[in-house]
Amino acid sequence: MERSFVMVKPDGVQRGLIGEVISRLERRGLKLVAAKLMRVSRELAEEHYAQLKDKPFFPSLIEFITSGPVMAMVWEGPNAISIIRKTMGATNPANAEPGTIRADFACDVSYNVVHGSDGPESAEREIRLWFGEVEPSYSRSVDRWIFPEG
């Protein structure tokens, strides 16, 4: 089973979209295995977005992510990363497919509601950074109908 980190950003939390994000991911068959509502320290934000440190928008990104609470989550399922990325839509909501989270709710590229890991390596790094060790997975009674191969 693949795991991915997902964060509802401060704009999504302020607008009451946590439930919408969770609902959409659950309807795609994914399983929520860890979650916490939290305020992000400057240190955590800078470490999370370290690969963007040299970008001109880095200071405003850190300011935004630390401006209010976020909902940090770990999701699990076959092809979880690609399913989550398709469900979120393009980073820039102007380019997001209709029916995706960002097309439906994001205001612009800076306030785009949600973050999701972009690959297995970043998922592992982000999950460890935000959660440390995540408990082993649990089984749902419906898993054998949703994922018949495994």
From Swiss-Prot:
Top-rank taxon: Bacteria
Q: What class of enzyme is it?
A: transferase
Q: Kindly list the positions annotated as binding ATP.
A: K9, F57, R85, T91, R102, N112
- Magnesium: present as a keyword of the record? yes
Which SUPFAM superfamilies does the entry link to? Nucleoside diphosphate kinase, NDK (SSF54919)
Tell me which InterPro entries the record gives: NDK-like_dom, NDK-like_dom_sf, Nucleoside_diP_kinase, Nucleoside_diP_kinase_AS
Instruction: Return the SMART domains for the record.
Output: NDK
| NCBIfam families the record matches | PRK00668.1 (NF001908)
The role this protein plays is:
Major role in the synthesis of nucleoside triphosphates other than ATP. The ATP gamma phosphate is transferred to the NDP beta phosphate via a ping-pong mechanism, using a phosphorylated active-site intermediate.
**What does the sequence similarity comment in the record state about its family?**
Belongs to the NDK family.
Q: How does it assemble?
A: Homotetramer.
Q: Give the protein's recorded name.
A: Nucleoside diphosphate kinase
Gene encoding this chain? ndk
